[in-house]
Amino acid sequence: LYAVQGWLFNHEGTRRGVEFVTRKITQNVARIADEFARKENFEPLRLGNIDSKRDWSDAEDFVDGVWKMLNQEEHLTYITRKKPDDYVLSSDETHTIKEFVEEAFNFAGFHRSICRWEGHGEEAKYYHGDDLLMEVDPKFYRPAEVDLLWGDSERARKELGWKPKTNFIQLVNKMVKHDMELLT
């Protein structure tokens, strides 16, 4: 029996469900950018803990990694003479939800040079000039919040020749662009 176990850290993309924080961010950033451009009043994005760190990668990169895992038997037979093994797929870096928010708004035209954070923790707010873009709302804190999820894909990189092609900023931009296009 050929069996492989893959540990896939947070993998995001344009098809991610809206119930996940990354898609909640990109969908709301697109909405806010659209309403701002039309000079309409808008409700800010509301999130829970923006200080938790995640190891985010593009789901498309993981498809390639999973394919390599499932086809490693041939690859490993010739190179290392090992049996199929288990691997972690991850970006090997972490970013806070706060960083995701900043990148998303930056891509949508709310440039960092004009935006600012006020307050910390449950009091954190993100402004563009006088316009409130995002605020922390304690009701969105999860009771069993994990502060840090961080992978180590060194083995998959060495043994399978896998590595992510999409970096964090590219991933955020891709997701925001997709949600902005859905509004046009």
For each of these PLM feature ranges, what is it?
Residues 5-7:
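Conserved beta-strand scaffold in the Rossmann-like NAD(H)/NADP(H)-binding core
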Residues 11-15:
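Conserved catalytic-site region of short-chain dehydrogenase/reductase
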Residues 16-184:
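C-terminal substrate-binding subdomain of Rossmann-fold SDR/epimerase-dehydratase oxidoreductases
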Residues 1-3:
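A glycine-centered loop/beta-turn motif at secondary-structure junctions
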